[in-house]
């Protein structure tokens, strides 16, 4: 048992080191895209904070989702955040599975370049929409009478550039469309294309639907915020996926051609005339019952022979 553990540990360590060297090479080539994506995440956070300064609380708008779904209440608002955190962490860990598992289909650096491109495009559209029209927030801390429904004006430029972690849960004004649904749908669609487990793919879409209902039931967004996110994110990912270069497929490395299959392939080529040198098909002349490979007629009586 100890010998088996040592052998497997050695294999795992070699696999990890090999993957590290591969990913470092990819990181050296693509670090600019990753850095740009992270900077855009920061800018998106600043934009969401900025709209909180100009948010004006008011009566909650009439909403079909609020009418159909019972309100969870402020004490149960953590449920949707728990589901989102589970989705985020699960996807994050999955992108690093090539470092551990033997079967792998993606490169970690390349998959995150692709994911960040999807996120940035969707967030750019989101910033445009929630700055175009500010709706009164339906969340409990955004309603009339709440002390945090509107941020006090900043006293310095440094305060504007600071990102408050609590703004993720206690922001107001950044409604159309839901940022949580952007991340959730991008992650689910990415695994749908590059994942290998069908059960997890189905479970991912089911989780996205449940997440949508929980967001509305928690009164964190209007129904329109969730609906717009569903078709906008899917359309953006669909269009960008056609434009971005496809990731190299790693599964071919795990499927070497065995000798039996190679023999069948060679026989198939021979039957179709593809496995023979084209030079062997050129016309040849017959000389005294013999074939001259150069196609030139030779006479054995020439030169008195």
UniProtKB/Swiss-Prot annotation:
EC id: 2.7.1.227
Pfam family, one: PAP2_C
Record key words, sorted: Golgi apparatus, Lipid biosynthesis, Lipid metabolism, Membrane, Plant defense, Sphingolipid metabolism, Transferase, Transmembrane, Transmembrane helix
Catalytic activity field: an N-(2R-hydroxy-very-long-chain fatty acyl)-(R)-4-hydroxysphingoid base + a 1,2-diacyl-sn-glycero-3-phospho-(1D-myo-inositol) = a 1D-myo-inositol-1-phospho-N-[(R)-2-hydroxy-very-long-chain fatty acyl]-(R)-4-hydroxysphingoid base + a 1,2-diacyl-sn-glycerol
Location in or out of the cell: Golgi apparatus, trans-Golgi network membrane
Alphabetical list of InterPro entries matching this protein: Sphingomyelin_synth-like (IPR045221), Sphingomyelin_synth-like_dom (IPR025749)
GO biological process, one term: defense response
Induction annotation: By powdery mildew (e.g. Golovinomyces cichoracearum and Pseudomonas syringae) inoculation.
Pathway: Sphingolipid metabolism
Tissue: Expressed in leaves, roots, stems, flowers and siliques.
Catalytic residues as annotated in Swiss-Prot or TrEMBL: 180, 221, 225
A cellular component term, taken from the record's GO annotations: trans-Golgi network
Keyword Lipid metabolism: yes
Reported consequences of knocking out the gene: Constitutive RPW8-mediated HR-like cell death characterized by salicylic acid (SA) accumulation, enhanced transcription of RPW8 and RPW8-dependent spontaneous HR-like cell death (SHL) in leaf tissues. Reduced plant stature. Sphingolipid (e.g. ceramides and hydroxyceramides) accumulation associated with a reduced inositol-phosphorylceramide synthase (IPCS) activity.
Membrane topology: Multi-pass membrane protein
Ranges that cross the membrane: 34-54, 81-101, 105-125, 168-188, 198-218, 221-241
Homology family: Belongs to the sphingomyelin synthase family.
Function according to Swiss-Prot or TrEMBL: Catalyzes the transfer of the phosphorylinositol group from phosphatidylinositol (PI) to phytoceramide, an essential step in sphingolipid biosynthesis. May play an important role in modulating plant programmed cell death (PCD) associated with defense (e.g. toward Golovinomyces cichoracearum) by promoting sphingolipid metabolism and thus regulating ceramide accumulation.
Official protein name in the record: Phosphatidylinositol:ceramide inositolphosphotransferase 2
Lineage, uppermost ranks: Eukaryota, Viridiplantae, Streptophyta, Embryophyta, Tracheophyta
């Amino acid at each position: 048992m100890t010998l088996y553990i040592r052998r497997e540990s050695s294999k795992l360590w070699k696999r990890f080191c090999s993957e590290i060297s591969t990913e470092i090479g990819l990181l050296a080539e693509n670090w600019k895209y990753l850095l740009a994506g992270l900077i855009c995440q920061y800018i998106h956070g600043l934009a969401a904070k900025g709209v909180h300064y100009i948010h004006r609380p008011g009566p909650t708008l009439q909403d079909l989702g609020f009418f159909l779904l019972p309100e969870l209440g402020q004490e149960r608002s953590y449920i949707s955040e728990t589901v989102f955190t589970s989705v985020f962490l699960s996807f994050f860990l999955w992108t690093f599975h090539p470092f551990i598992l033997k079967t792998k289909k993606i490169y970690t650096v390349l998959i995150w370049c692709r994911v960040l491109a999807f996120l940035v495009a969707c967030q750019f559209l989101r910033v445009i929409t929630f700055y175009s029209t500010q709706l009164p927030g339906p969340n409990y801390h955004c309603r009339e009478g709440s002390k945090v429904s509107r941020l006090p004006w900043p006293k310095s430029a440094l305060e504007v550039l600071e990102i408050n972690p609590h703004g993720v849960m206690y922001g107001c004004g950044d409604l159309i469309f839901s940022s949580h649904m952007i991340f959730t749908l991008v992650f689910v669609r990415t695994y749908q294309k590059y994942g290998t487990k069908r059960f997890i793919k189905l479970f991912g879409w089911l989780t996205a639907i449940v997440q949508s209902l929980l967001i509305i039931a928690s009164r964190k967004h209007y129904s329109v915020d969730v609906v717009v996110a569903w078709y906008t994110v899917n359309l953006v990912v669909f269009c960008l996926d056609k434009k971005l270069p496809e990731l190299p497929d790693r599964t071919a490395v795990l499927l070497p051609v065995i000798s039996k299959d190679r023999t069948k392939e060679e026989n198939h080529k021979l039957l179709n005339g593809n496995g023979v040198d084209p030079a062997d098909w050129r016309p040849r002349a017959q000389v005294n019952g013999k074939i001259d490979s150069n196609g030139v007629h030779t006479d054995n009586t020439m030169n008195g022979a």
